[in-house]
Structure formats: structure tokens, C-alpha cells
Amino acid sequence: SADLLSSIGLTDIRRIFRHKNVTKSTSIDEKKFTNEELRKIAFHIRINRPMSLYARCWIFVEGETEIWLLNEFASMLGISLQAEGVRLVEYAQCGVAPLIKLAKQLGIEWLLLTDGDEAGYKYARHAVNAGNEDRVTILPSIDIEHFLYENGFENVYRRNTGETSLKGLNENKIIEIALKRNTKPGMALAIVDEARLIGKQCVPELFQKIFARSLVKSNTS
């Protein structure tokens, strides 16, 4: 159970799974992690997200906004990520490197979604340099907010600025005002509400491809 997992040490965890009709048992080799990495993943995964250890595939995303949106978009497409053994795991507080190492040691498949800014490319390079290019998706925009603005949800940001006139304001300024007025999680919920009104056709193709890949990896893990 999740309660049991959160109460025992990382190195005491054993994950049993089938791969190509062979049953395997995996555990964590703490020698492959620094003390700081062990501390971070113990808190981030074992204590805060123990149920993620039961997943067959992790999708690493930057933060809370992506968690809200991707779960909702998947649901709109008739996909229950949890039922499919897929878990969204935010990496902003922990970093990508230790989470990828953890997934590999436990035999959990994974995908990475990063922003298109400098930090996002840094995370992506780390994964690609380890030979995982096919697992990495970089947003074609500097962050999730700009991506959504440019892919069907511009009106949501414009509406949530609270301004009667947006004349002379560019995309960056409109997003900045909307986020300042509503916060990032608040805007995520506004996007979700709009998406529910429009229907599944509004789900960006990039996200649809990530879901499809995650299901393939989950079902072959």
C-alpha cells in the first residue's frame, strides 16, 4: 500500500514486473545516487508520491500546471492515465536526473516533457546525452502558458487579464497580466474549463502524441 511504501527506506523497496514474458525483481542501488539525490527522491517520491511506484510509466513534467492540464486533456480523450499505469511526476523540486535514474533502476518506463526555454533544453540535453532522445519532448514555446496561448487558448488568457482593452499588448504581456491576476494554477483551471466547453478536438496534437507513447510504453513494461 502507499502507507507502507512511505514508511520504509528506498533501498528496502522491491519492484516486481513482467517484461517480455519474464518476471523480474528490481531494487535501488544507492551507490548510484548522491546523498542529496537520495534525500530528494525519498521525499519527492517515497513520502509525497508513493503511489507513483506502482505505475508502469512516468511522464515527467515541470510542475502543477502540467499535472492539472495533462490529466484533464487525457480524460477528455477517454484515457484514464491512472488505470493505464501512467503517472505524471513533476520534477521542478527534485530535478530530472535523479528521477530518471530511479525509473531506470526500478524498471519503470518514462517520458520527459520540458519547456522550450534554456532550463528546459538543459533538462532535455541531460536525457538525450544518456541515449534517450525518443523519450524527450520539448515544447515549441518557452513554457506551457505560451504553448497554450499559441495553440487554441489565446482567448482564455485575453479574457482573464481583466482588461477592457488589450490594444498594444503583445503575447508576453497578456500572459504576464493574466498570470499575475489569476496565478498559474488558476489559469490552468481556466484552460480546463474552456477545454470542457470546446471538447476533445481542442487537445493539442503534441499532448495526444505523448499520451499515445506513454500507453505503448506502459503496456510493454
Predicted regions and their residues:
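Hydrophobic transmembrane alpha-helix bundles
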Residues: 1-8, 34-39, 120-129, 153-158, ...
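Conserved GHKL (Bergerat-fold) ATPase module
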Residues: 2, 185, 197-198
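RecA-like P-loop NTPase motor core
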Residues: 3-119, 133
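Generic structural signal for hydrophobic core residues of well-folded globular domains
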Residues: 8, 73, 148-152, 156, ...
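Exposed alpha-helical structural elements
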Residues: 36-40, 98, 143, 155, ...
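Activity-critical C-terminal alpha-helical subdomain
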Residues: 115, 122-193
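Terminal low-complexity/disordered tails
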Residues: 189-221
